[in-house]
Curated annotation (Swiss-Prot):
It comes from Corynebacterium diphtheriae (strain ATCC 700971 / NCTC 13129 / Biotype gravis). GO terms for biological process: carbohydrate metabolic process; fructose 6-phosphate metabolic process; protein N-linked glycosylation; UDP-N-acetylglucosamine metabolic process. It is found in: Cytoplasm. This is Glutamine--fructose-6-phosphate aminotransferase [isomerizing]. NCBIfam families: glmS, PRK00331.1. It is an enzyme of class 2 (transferase). The lineage of its organism: Bacteria, Bacillati, Actinomycetota, Actinomycetes, Mycobacteriales.
Amino acid sequence: MCGIVGFVGRTSVPDRDYFALDVVLEGLRRLEYRGYDSAGVAVVADGAVSFRKKAGKVQALEQELETSPMPQSCLGIGHTRWATHGGPTDANAHPHVVDGGKLAVVHNGIIENFAELKSELLGFGHNFVSETDTEVAATLLGHIFNNEANKDLTRAMQLTCQRLEGAFTLLAIHAETPDRIVAARRNSPLVIGVGEGENFLGSDVSGFIDYTKNAVEMDNDQIVTITADGYHITDFQGNHAEGKPFVVEWDAQAAEKGGYEFFMEKEIHEQPAAVRDTLMGRFDESGKLTLDELRIDESTLRSIDKIIVIACGTAAYAGHVARYAIEHWCRIPTEVELAHEFRYRDPIVNEKTLVVTLSQSGETMDTLMAVRHAREQGAKVIAICNTNGSSIPRESDACLYTHAGPEIAVASTKAFLAQITATYLLGLYLAQLRGNMFADEVNAVLGELRTIPDKVSAVLDGVEDQVKTLAQDMKDATSVLFLGRHVGFPVALEGALKLKELAYLHAEGFAAGELKHGPIALIEEGQPVFVIVPSPRGRDSLHAKVVSNIQEVRARGAITIVIAEEGDDAVEAYANHIIRIPQAPTLMQPLLATVPLQIFACGVAAAKGFDVDQPRNLAKSVTVE
């Protein structure tokens, strides 16, 4: 939620044909996927701060800049805002400019004590023109800059942050310190980009990936001052601190659409590579599974007596899939918790509990808070994450990175498959370590996992046109139901979520066994129902029961869309539409059956003319509670 960009460069660099405004606007475009409702920029030039801001998309801001240009500069900041305090208006957009027009501030997060601070600042004679907590933070910073910090912007930021409560990232520039940006972070993302004769700040590396792949992750409660020649990090008290350098593993081209109409469509097609890259490098020369990233003592992992998977949204459904596999392979009781519920229900967690978190961005605030709570109770935490340099891996005991590459579309696709793959690897590793499975059994499952990338490609090649046609035909549906059993149940939940997110229509996923306990009342003539059918080569009773469920809804007038593996003839008599996927063991099926549901949701949204990559009201990275 919200995107932040900062740039400082030398005034004269050979062969450089861009200025601060170019860098900042490009960074904001790269960060659009995070979700926003207004945008703004500010630069320091000729001893003054110049700024523009506009409700709406970055394109609206660019149109404003065409009619009202800003001066060239080598220092600037930019922001895309997701409204929390105050509506999405020009006045509430960032940057907020105070101190007689000399100080510009952008902010991501929520200042929880802003009302108290605002009252105090009103007492000092300051006035406010917006409804935002950001203007309060900016005014406090300006007040301290002039009255307590001897006009030292870094010191003023340190003193300001000591007064603020909540989660925030702040970037500030001042006309009287025209060579630097000062930034702070607490429980909100901020990454430093390191160039030659220029340096950058961003909510994530997408904000500066066009210019450098060298980055530095900051810790919590830190402040950084960047100039053209370097950066310096302190804590909020002014003590010297260090960041952790890393190199971004992908380039700007990976964050382009690459010929596809939508980022989501591209990312659906990148899923074979996402699974393959998540598997890569996690086996020794003999083929044995080795997870070197798990910096947790083996004796500790052997003593685990409970696993809790913590996540939100799509990642939580990946966790539900993983639960079936982990319990089956490891024989360890496994729970799946929504992060925002976990913290508030007094969960039973101790030193024999292993917490596994799933987060694509690594910045999901509810999940981050759950990590801290779990560790306070003595649990070990393993993060499964797609973003290097993010907060959740840094605060966990170990991390398995999914290596899925940048996921730009708000609705998650390839991260979901990569998360399932990574949790499967973790489950197999624990089973191997604890002696729950023989080596040949582990190798057999790994062999099946290695076939998944090609099978996902086969799904894409085999059913994409069929599913897109179905989506076009069903674009006027007002409600769609999804049914599944066993691992097909969380797939049904994910299919429903995708349709809600993208097509803005009622969609619900149910455990098929619950039909007669209530949901069957929703079935009427013409009701579309997707059914995920388990392999007939698995538990016969499971397959037979799902076929029976198809018969039940079909008999009541439902339009049945069945996802079944090749060769499963039992469904043909009861399906209006059959989407065929390659044969795979039951636990592998979610990695295949999910793909047509992603294509369907994308197709319905496109047919309705909706923004596929940036659905209304949604943000890619939910960085506030």
